[in-house]
Structures are given as structure tokens and as C-alpha cells.
């Protein structure tokens, strides 16, 4: 008889204690629940994005496979057409009609020859092959090319060669140090010309006099 009221008292006391504990921890329970809810929503979004990406990847793979298959088909068609062209035995199949009378034959030359060279034309009426080549300027060997030397007359105002005397009749300009003077008077202001002494010049004059005397003696003999 005593056990029944004891059990009821313990049950009531336990429920009250549990309710009190839950009341105290209600804030923590709410925060945990909210955090779990947020985590679940994020997981759902990640799963949905992964599923969409997987679908897009499968679509892109299928598109790539379709593109590759289309390229292979085009290559097969090109190979077939090339084989048909190569297997063609008739030479007329590879000719190009320029107009009604002339037929242009396929060029067997190198690409550089075709750029700088000629084109072969076949005339159907005369059955003759004529090569039309680009005109080039050729200098004949008989033609003489004037060379710029000392004898050529040039405009002194436009003399470009400092080593050539374009005016032999007049005295050379002092501004050009590379042209030798015709007389024996050497300029002192020109550092490039060799300065001869008076003894050297007198010696040259004496040599000329001796040469004149010897020539006169020889003529008398």
C-alpha cells in the first residue's frame, strides 16, 4: 500500500524537475535547433547545385561528342572527295577554263616560281603552248654604265664625293681638305695637306732646270 503513493510522488517530482530543466535550457535548445536548420538548408542548396552541375557536364560532354562526330564525318567526306579527284584519269578534269578559247593547265611549279614566274596557257585552236612571263628589266652587256670618276662633270654645289675634284680648271676649295691642289702653293690653314718646306720646293725647281738643260744638250748632239 505504501509503494503506490511513493511511485506517484517520484513520477510527479521527476516530471516537474524535467520541465524545470527544459525551461532553463530553452534558449540553448532554440539556438541549436536554428543552427541545425540553417545547416540543413545549406546542405540542400549544395546538393541542388551539384545536381545542376552534373546535368550541365553531361550535356557538355554530349555536345562535345556530337561535335567530334561531326568533324570526323566532315573529314571523311573531304577524304572521299580528294580521292575522287586524284583517281580521275582524264587530264581535262583538272584544267581551268579561262575563257572560251584558252584553257589554263595546272601549274607543276613550286609556289615561289608561280609567284615570280609564269603561267602556262594552252591554245585549243593552234595546239601550241605559249608561256607568258612577267617582264623584267635586263641591262645588256654592250651598254656602258657611266662611272663617277674624276673626269665626269658634276655640279659643284651638289658634289657628294669629297675625294673627287669636280672642277679641275679652278683652284680647289679650301673647305675640302681631301682634294689636292694643282699648284705648289700649299695652304697653311689646312691640317690634312702635307706642308713642304722651301728647300724641298727649290730642289724641285732645280731638278726641273737640270732636266731642261739635259734635254737641250741631247737635242744639240
From Swiss-Prot:
One of its GO terms (cellular component) is host cell plasma membrane. A motif (NPF-motif) lies at residues 161-163, 176-178, 190-192. Residues 23-221 are cytoplasmic. It holds the Pfam family Orthopox_A36R. Interacts with host NCK. Interacts with protein OPG161 (via C-terminus). Interacts with protein OPG056. Interacts (via C-terminus) with host kinesin light chain/KLC1. Interacts with host intersectin-1/ITSN1 and EPS15. Its main location: host cell. Changing residue 132 to F: About 20% loss of virus-induced actin tail formation. The chain crosses the membrane at residues 2-22. InterPro entries: Orthopox_A36R (IPR010274). Changing residue 112 to F: About 85% loss of virus-induced actin tail formation. It is found in: Host cell membrane. Involved in the intracellular transport and egress of virions to the host cell surface with help of protein OPG056. Also participates in the formation of actin tails at the plasma membrane to allow efficient actin-based motility and thus cell to cell transmission of viral particles. Recruits host intersectin-1/ITSN1 and activates host CDC42 to drive ARP2/3-mediated actin polymerization. It comes from Vaccinia virus (strain Western Reserve). This is Protein OPG164. GO terms for biological process: actin-dependent intracellular transport of virus; symbiont-mediated cell-to-cell migration in host; viral release from host cell. It is a single-pass membrane protein. Phosphorylated on Tyr-112 and Tyr-132. Phosphorylations activate the host ARP2-ARP3 complex and lead to actin nucleation. Belongs to the orthopoxvirus A36 protein family. Keywords: Host cell membrane, Host membrane, Host-virus interaction, Membrane, Phosphoprotein, Transmembrane, Transmembrane helix. Residues 1 are extracellular. The modification Phosphotyrosine is found at residues 112, 132.
Amino acid at each position: 500500500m505504501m509503494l503506490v503513493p511513493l511511485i506517484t510522488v517520484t513520477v510527479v517530482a521527476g516530471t516537474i524537475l524535467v520541465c524545470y530543466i527544459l525551461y532553463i535550457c530553452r534558449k540553448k535548445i532554440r539556438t541549436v535547433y536554428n543552427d541545425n536548420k540553417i545547416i540543413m538548408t545549406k546542405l540542400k542548396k549544395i546538393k541542388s547545385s551539384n545536381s545542376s552541375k552534373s546535368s550541365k557536364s553531361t550535356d557538355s560532354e554530349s555536345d562535345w561528342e556530337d561535335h567530334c562526330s561531326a568533324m570526323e564525318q566532315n573529314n571523311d567526306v573531304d577524304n572521299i572527295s580528294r580521292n575522287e579527284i586524284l583517281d580521275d584519269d582524264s587530264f581535262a578534269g583538272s584544267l581551268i577554263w579561262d575563257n572560251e578559247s584558252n584553257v589554263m593547265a595546272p601549274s607543276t611549279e613550286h609556289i615561289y616560281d608561280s609567284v615570280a614566274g609564269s603561267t602556262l596557257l594552252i591554245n585549243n585552236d593552234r595546239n601550241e603552248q605559249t608561256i607568258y612571263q612577267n617582264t623584267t628589266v635586263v641591262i645588256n652587256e654592250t651598254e656602258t654604265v657611266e662611272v663617277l670618276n674624276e673626269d665626269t662633270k658634276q655640279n659643284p654645289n651638289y658634289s657628294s664625293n669629297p675625294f673627287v675634284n669636280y672642277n679641275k680648271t679652278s683652284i680647289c676649295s679650301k673647305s675640302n681638305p681631301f682634294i689636292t691642289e694643282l699648284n705648289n702653293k700649299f695652304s697653311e690653314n689646312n691640317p690634312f695637306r702635307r706642308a713642304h718646306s722651301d728647300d724641298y720646293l727649290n730642289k724641285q725647281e732645280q731638278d726641273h732646270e737640270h732636266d731642261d738643260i739635259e734635254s737641250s744638250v741631247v737635242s744639240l748632239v
